[in-house]
Curated annotation (Swiss-Prot):
The gene is rpsO. This is Small ribosomal subunit protein uS15. The lineage of its organism: Bacteria, Bacillati, Actinomycetota, Actinomycetes, Bifidobacteriales. Keywords: Ribonucleoprotein, Ribosomal protein, RNA-binding, rRNA-binding. Pfam families: Ribosomal_S15 (PF00312). The keyword S-adenosyl-L-methionine does not apply. GO terms for molecular function: rRNA binding; structural constituent of ribosome. It comes from Bifidobacterium adolescentis (strain ATCC 15703 / DSM 20083 / NCTC 11814 / E194a). The keyword RNA-binding applies.
Length: 89
């Protein structure tokens, strides 16, 4: 299911680094993580939905690139975000 406007605003408010922040790597990664989790649940029921699976793989790649950027720019923000989101790395 798609991300509702309320869910999106809640995620933005939680991970924003300052007021009005919607584009920081933290916010983008958090939004992608929620979309990835939702799509993963969808694919558990619809195993043959290969178009959505491709979208999932693209989102995972985008998130990985953003995390690599954040790690390169500010390792402390990276570690904090990984811990807050509960990601493996």
């Amino acid at each position: 299911m798609a991300l509702t406007a309320e869910e999106k605003q809640e995620i933005i408010k939680t991970y924003a680094t300052h007021e009005g922040d919607t584009g920081s790597p933290e916010v983008q990664v958090a939004l992608l993580t929620k979309r990835i989790a939702d799509l993963t649940e969808h694919l558990k029921e619809h195993k043959h939905d290969h178009h959505s699976r491709r979208g999932l793989l693209l989102m995972v790649g985008d998130r990985r690139r953003m995390l690599d950027y954040l790690k390169r720019v500010d390792i402390n923000r990276y570690r904090s975000l990984i811990e807050r989101l509960g990601l493996r790395r």
